[in-house]
Amino acid sequence: LGLAYGNWLAGIQNMGFKWRGQIGENSGGLDLRYVGLSDLELRSNKPTSKPLGYYSAYGISARGITSREIGAIKFGLALQLIELEIYQESSRGVAFDFGATWSINEYFKFNISALNFGRMNKLESSAPELPKRLVNSVSFDQKSSSLFIGIESNSLLNDMIYYVGGNSKYKNLFFGGTATSTKGMKSISGGVGFLLGIYTITYGFQWGDHHLGRPQM
């Protein structure tokens, strides 16, 4: 069970809820997420000291997850319901995720996933395009540490995205980081966490080269 809250540039807020558990022979989960603004100003074409009003823009998603392990391969499937709203316009849609992990041996794993394959209803005159993603990665796990490299194809970008990162754990402390690179963009993200019995406290950051600030969660 997990709860998260974050804030970023211009008052953007995000909140998340996660649950993981066992459902019969399968593993299951539920993810809820909200990202939004609540103080956008509506103004006319003429300069005024006060706005005509205020409105919000937000996105909400609810995702159900199930997974099952067959031999050395673990399969996962997710169904996601999405709602977007800005001013007086809204759009709803559905997306599917699929993933598989093959344990090559005791240390190496090969991962493949297809994310955000679905569609949205029209938002005013056109439907929002979901960022369809195909991600492949190889990870190396040893005791309390893990390293990985990955490559991603994204329908909204012409160039591939490359990842390299890792994480480690020492007693009740765990930490990790990831470097991401594609044409015109590079970023570094990381975080630390502390286990307190059944509770976990985490702090994360992401730093990019678009100078949009440093989001924290």
Model-derived features with residue positions:
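Subset of outer-membrane beta-barrel
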Residues: 1-217
